[in-house]
Amino acid sequence: MDFFPKKQPTLSNFIVGSNSEAVAVISELKEGRGPQFTYLWGYEGVGKTHLVRALGKQSEGVPAFDENRTIYAVDNVQDLTPEQQQELFVLYNTVREHPGTHLVVTADRSPKDFERQGFRKDLTSRFSWGVVFELSPLSDEQKRQVILEAASQTGLKVAPEVLNWIENNFPRDMHTMSNLLHSLDRYAMSAKRAVTIPLIKEWLERNQDTKEDR
């Protein structure tokens, strides 16, 4: 999970949880080994983009094939336009023709689910080439421990009762938690106060007032 966006995503700061097999494959790819095709899927916040960025090979959209390049990555393929789908189709075929090159794609759904979403079938059939991994989210206890550790590393102290209140009043996905902690850290520092439930409620009210003034 990518908890603090200011950090460069790496394999060392990825919280593995139950995704050890997928992380092992990404590690192999960084070393120039591993499967030619890798498909990572899962809900938002499970770490797909983190792993792609850890490869250091992410491009905007669909990258063109380059004889001097060995790893290609395409993030969030569910958002591709019809033109980009054609580009990815060509990339799949070209990579397959060049042993020693690798392609990693990520999505928010399984390859089979794409078949019911109107994507071109000759592309979605290629999503199952190579290995397919569903990334699993962290358990609530794992999330809690990582949030506390990450907050501690930035000097942000969050009491257990405050964390309980946050978990009961905000979505528990890690993107939300990460952004929330960053915002609360900045607000608490500017107010020169500790992060407490009253401070969080005050912060929420101010944000609501700001939205209404727009």
Regions from the language model: what does each represent?
Residues 170-184:
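The conserved phosphate-sensing helix
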Residues 157-170:
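Short conserved motifs of the RecA-like P-loop NTPase core
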Residues 188-207:
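Conserved C-terminal helix/linker of AAA+ ATPases
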Residues 111-128:
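Short regulatory helix/loop adjacent to the ATP-binding pocket of P-loop NTPases
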Residues 63-94, 102-110:
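Conserved P-loop NTPase "ATPase switch" module shared by AAA+ and STAND
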Residues 34-51:
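Walker A/P-loop nucleotide-binding motif
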Residues 1-23:
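Dynamic helix-loop-helix/coil hinge segments at AAA+ ATPase domain boundaries and subdomain interfaces
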